[in-house]
C-alpha cells in the first residue's frame, strides 16, 4: 500500500443466497491483522491484492468458469470496455454496481514501465478502485430451427458425416440471425493517472495475467500499513 493516498478500513460485500431469494451483506475489516495475497512484483508497483474469503453453504457465488465467460475478444486501441463498480458509493438498490464505459487508450500488448497494465480513457471516480474491467462486442449468432437442431444431433450421433450435415442445412435457415453482446474479463481497474497536479481522465487497468500470477504465487502477507 506504499504511495497510496487513501486506505479503507472496511470492505462491504454482498452475497446472494444460492436460489437468489435474498442478498446477504457482510463486512471485511482491514487492520494490522489482515492478511492478503500480493503479487511478487508488488515492490515494483503492481497495485493489486487478493483477500481470501471463506464462503459458507448458505450463500451462492459465481465464477468465470460457471458462466463460461471465455469468449475471445481481440483487444486494440479504442476497443470498448466497461468498468463495473461503485463510483462515489453509488449503487442500485444498495448492492448492484454501476457500469461505466470507456475505451482502451494505449497499446494493450505494450508493457508500461515494464509492467503488464494499460491505460483507459474513462471518467472514473473514487470508489471504483478494484473494479473488474470487461471488454465487449456484438457478435452475430444464428437462431437454429428445430429441423437444423435435429440434423446436428444426427451429426453428433455419427449418422451424418460433415459434408452430409452441411449439405442438409436449408440455406434460408442461415439468414435467421441475432446480435448478441459478448463480454470478457480483461483486468482490474486501480486508479487514475496524475500528471503534475492535473488529472487527464486516464485510468490504469492491470491485466488478468497478473491476477492469475498473484493467485498462483500464494504470496500471503499481513497489512504493512494499517488504515488511517
Where are the model-predicted features located?
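Short amphipathic, basic-aromatic surface patches that mediate peripheral association
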Residues: 1-3
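Serine endopeptidase catalytic core focused on the charge-relay Asp
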Residues: 5-115, 121-122, 126, 130, ...
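C-terminal subregion of chymotrypsin/trypsin-like serine protease catalytic domains
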Residues: 135-228
